[in-house]
């Protein structure tokens, strides 16, 4: 398995997404969505260049869209860093 880590903010984003799903759609759907997002993150770690660069948003960042969320990530010496997992927000401010 390829190496990746979640930033503190991305971990908080993931937890918030799960709680929102749990409260609004129930345990089964929250688990299904979280499992799918984890699979996407593992795919990103394995094939980080599969998804487009978003240099116009932030230098060195890439973007993968999973259903209604955007996964922003970058590469460093240790592998993939998942920076944020966002819905519709001001991306520029959220990535600073």
Predicted regions and their residues:
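Enriched for short, Lys/Arg-rich terminal
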Residues: 69-96
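Short proline/glycine- and basic residue-enriched helix-capping loop/turn segments at helix->loop/beta transitions
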Residues: 44-46
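Basic/aromatic recognition patch in beta-strand/loop cores that engages polyanionic ligands
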Residues: 51-79
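Arg/Lys-rich, positively charged N-terminal/basic patches that mediate binding to nucleic acids
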Residues: 1-32
């Amino acid at each position: 398995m390829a190496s990746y880590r979640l930033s503190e903010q991305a971990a908080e984003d993931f937890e918030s997404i799960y709680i929102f799903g749990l409260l609004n759609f129930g345990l089964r759907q929250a688990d299904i969505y979280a499992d799918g997002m984890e699979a996407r993150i593992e795919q990103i770690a394995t094939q980080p260049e599969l998804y487009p660069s978003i240099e116009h948003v932030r230098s060195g960042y890439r973007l993968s869209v999973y259903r209604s969320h955007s996964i922003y990530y970058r590469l460093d010496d240790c592998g993939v860093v998942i920076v944020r997992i966002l819905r519709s927000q001001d991306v520029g401010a959220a990535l600073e």
